[in-house]
């Protein structure tokens, strides 16, 4: 982990940073998300299938990952980018770090690039094909792979993310969730 990693866009724009996920090569449509929190939900949101998601908030990973906050059974995005991955996870519900989660789920991820510059480029040009790599660091090879990667336009991604069978949601609220809202009523006043 923390080996060199590279993002190259189909137009040849290059960003070099550090790996915070699995080793390998991943292609996808590079997009951004402006949420300050919820990175775990973004990782497991099926609507990000085939996309490399860039987080605009500067530090990601500070509350770790837990099995209660997933949107689906596994991550669906192609890759993940952030400015800085927090080395400290501070949440009593956390079961693993963001880096551990990305690695164990085979997600190629990158930190340490100028995400503001990348987001500005995407905002002006629109989403574009890109490639994340920790193994092939040859610019020419990566640009060609990004340009020749399959487009998401017209692709039936629903079939790729749909579970094979329906699941029943019958869990109760976690023990830390307040069961009674009577304490809120004490602050209510009668205005009539």
Mark where each language-model region is.
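Acidic, glycine-enriched active-site microenvironments
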Residues: 2-11, 15-16
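Acidic-leg catalytic submotif of subtilisin-like serine proteases
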Residues: 192
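Flexible inter-domain linker/hinge segments
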Residues: 122, 136-181
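Secondary-structure junction/capping motif
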Residues: 93-97, 175, 189
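Feature captures the catalytic cores and cofactor-binding loops of soluble hydro-lyases/lyases
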Residues: 13-141
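Structural beta-strand/beta-sheet cores of well-ordered domains, especially the beta-sheet scaffolds
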Residues: 3-5, 28, 78, 157-159
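Residue-level preference for short coil/turn positions at secondary-structure junctions
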Residues: 1-3, 48-49, 76, 177-180
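Conserved small/polar residues in nucleotide/adenosyl-binding loops
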Residues: 182-189
């Amino acid at each position: 982990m923390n080996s060199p990693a590279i993002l190259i866009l189909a137009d040849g724009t290059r960003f070099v940073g550090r790996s915070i996920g699995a080793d390998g090569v991943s292609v996808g449509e590079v997009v951004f998300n402006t949420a300050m929190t919820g990175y775990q939900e973004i990782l497991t949101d099926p609507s990000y299938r085939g996309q490399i998601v860039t987080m605009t908030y500067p530090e990601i990973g500070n509350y770790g990952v837990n099995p209660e906050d997933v949107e689906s059974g596994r991550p669906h995005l192609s890759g993940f980018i952030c400015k800085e991955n927090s080395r400290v996870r501070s949440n009593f519900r956390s079961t693993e770090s963001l880096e551990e989660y990305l690695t164990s789920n085979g997600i190629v991820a990158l930190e340490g690039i100028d995400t503001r510059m990348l987001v500005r480029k995407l905002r002006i040009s629109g989403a574009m094909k890109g490639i994340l790599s920790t193994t092939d660091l040859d610019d020419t090879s990566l640009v060609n792979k990004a340009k020749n990667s399959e487009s998401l336009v017209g692709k039936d991604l629903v079939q790729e993310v749909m579970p094979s069978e329906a699941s029943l949601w019958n869990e109760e609220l976690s023990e830390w969730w307040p069961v009674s809202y009577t304490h809120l009523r004490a602050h209510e006043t009668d205005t009539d």
